[in-house]
Design a protein with these regions (language model features):
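Basic, glycine/proline-rich low-complexity segments that contact nucleic acids
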Residues: 1-87, 108-186
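Short, flexible active-site-proximal loops enriched in glycine and acidic residues
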Residues: 84-92, 101-104
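SH3/SH3-like beta-barrel fold
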Residues: 92-96, 172-175
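Short, structured beta-strand/loop micro-motifs enriched in basic residues and often containing a Trp
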Residues: 95-102, 120-126
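Beta-strand/loop nucleic-acid-binding surfaces
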Residues: 99-111
Length: 186
């Protein structure tokens, strides 16, 4: 991910480093995978202001992201890598061979035109999805399910990942940064 260093015009920008956004494609988002969201503007369900200084901002459309990756053994091609206003990570638009389109969280190093797949036994490449039990010890993983079939819940934000540190019977021991030292997953 290319980084942009800001000019030290003020004290706040002296050591500021941000994303250069050069990896993002200029395609418009897929309309079938968009939903409108209503801004709460700091109001609760009764309409009363419960959070001060909230409101305004740019209108956002929610992108429906596939956290389950349950389309097994069907290859897909990365059509574009896009910005998502609701999360820190970029998202990738996948075009499956059967014609379906889905968004996933884009791991670092994913390129447009790359072929990826979700399967039980799969090559270890960036973007492929597999059960934790089939991956080798020491592999970096992201978008981890805590409960089978519930979808990814761990290591979903930009730059976050977990490391497979061992196995204990049918469980896999995963080390997540800044969390419990080890989390057991199937």
């Amino acid at each position: 991910m290319p980084l942009r260093k800001y000019k030290p015009i003020t004290a706040g920008t002296r050591w500021r480093i941000g994303n250069a956004y050069t990896e993002i494609t200029t395609n418009k988002p897929e309309k079938s995978l968009l939903e409108s969201t209503k801004s709460t503007a700091g109001r609760n369900v009764q309409g009363r202001r419960s959070m001060r200084y909230m409101g305004g901002g740019h209108k956002k459309m929610y992108r429906l992201v596939d956290f389950k990756r349950d389309k097994k053994d069907i290859p897909a091609v990365v059509a574009s890598i896009e910005y998502d206003p609701h999360r820190t990570a970029f998202i990738a638009l996948l075009n499956y061979v059967d014609g379906e389109k889905r968004y996933i969280i884009a791991p670092q190093g994913l390129k447009v035109g790359q072929k990826i797949i979700s399967a039980e036994k799969v090559e270890i490449e960036i973007g492929n999805a597999a059960p934790l039990g089939t991956l080798p010890i020491g592999a970096n993983v992201h978008n981890i399910e805590l409960t089978l079939g519930r979808g990814g819940q761990l290591a979903r934000s930009a730059g976050s990942f977990a490391i497979i540190t061992g196995r204990d019977g049918e469980y896999t021991i995963v080390d997540v940064y800044k969390r419990q030292p080890h989390i057991l997953c199937r």
